[in-house]
A protein has these predicted regions:
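Extended low-complexity, serine/threonine- and proline-enriched intrinsically disordered segments
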Residues: 29-58
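Short amphipathic, basic-aromatic surface patches that mediate peripheral association
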Residues: 15-27, 168
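Catalytic cores of secreted or luminal carbohydrate-active enzymes
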Residues: 1-12
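Short beta-turn/strand-loop junction motif enriched in small, turn-promoting residues
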Residues: 21, 75-77
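Short, surface-exposed loop/turn motifs at beta-strand boundaries within globular domains
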Residues: 7-9, 29-31, 63-65, 83
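Non-globular targeting/processing and membrane-anchoring segments
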Residues: 3-4, 24, 32
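Solvent-exposed helix-loop boundary motif
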Residues: 52-54, 60-74, 81-119, 124-202
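Short coil-to-beta strand junction motifs in C2/discoidin
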Residues: 27-35, 85, 173-175
């Protein structure tokens, strides 16, 4: 069997024939998904307790970093290049950049490998759909890097500056408005603003 990897390359190619196929986006109207946001995973920080509550309330177990986005074609197909030997999860995004689903598992491509699937968590017994799709007639898309570059993200770095700029004039710990100031942390490292805003954001 010929080797499908090219060890001198640093990227793999990923191809999805129709993102609306399968259980992953069941019930999502065609045309909703405009792009995919790709995340990679990081190792847990040194001496981190083996408990997802140390990463965030109701969050995943993993520390993530944003790699970027790639466009989805009108017919639901997508093909893109992404770093090889890197666990990647995928978020389908709507026209406003809002995630309509989250891939809870991950996929990894070897250098130079082409990784393909029919859709989003389609049945393992489903065969390729016999049709030509838009993405297969183009070169693979390159990642559009996120604002600020490839990086991990945290509440303190991404959300707290917005609260400081737009909210704490009223939500300053005085009166009836709940406190959205940053800085103070509890025993698990959660700030006052994080704990107060969490019940309203899921």
């Amino acid at each position: 069997i010929p080797d499908r990897v090219k060890l001198d390359e640093k990227e793999a190619t990923f191809f999805i024939q129709d993102i609306y196929e399968g259980e992953g986006l069941k019930g999502i109207p065609r045309g909703t998904v405009k792009a995919l946001r790709l995340h990679a995973y990081e190792y847990a920080y040194l001496k981190t307790t083996s408990d997802h509550n140390w990463h965030g309330i109701q969050s995943g177990w993993d520390i993530k970093r944003i790699l970027g986005t790639v466009p989805v074609e009108e017919d639901g197909s997508v093909m893109f290049k992404a770093p090889a030997n890197t666990p990647i999860s995928i978020q389908p995004l709507d026209k406003d950049g809002v995630a309509v689903q989250w891939m809870r598992s991950w996929v990894t491509g070897q250098p130079g490998e082409i990784v393909s699937c029919v859709g989003c968590h389609e049945s393992q017994n489903q065969v390729v759909i016999p049709k030509r799709v838009i993405a297969s007639q183009k070169k693979p898309a390159s990642l559009t890097l996120p604002e600020g570059g490839v990086r991990s993200f945290t509440f303190d770095l991404e959300v707290q500056p917005i609260l400081d700029r737009a909210c704490i004039a009223c939500h300053n710990g005085e009166g009836k408005a709940f406190d959205l100031r940053g800085g103070k942390k509890d025993g698990q490292g959660y700030g006052t603003s994080y704990l107060n805003i969490h019940p309203y954001v899921h």
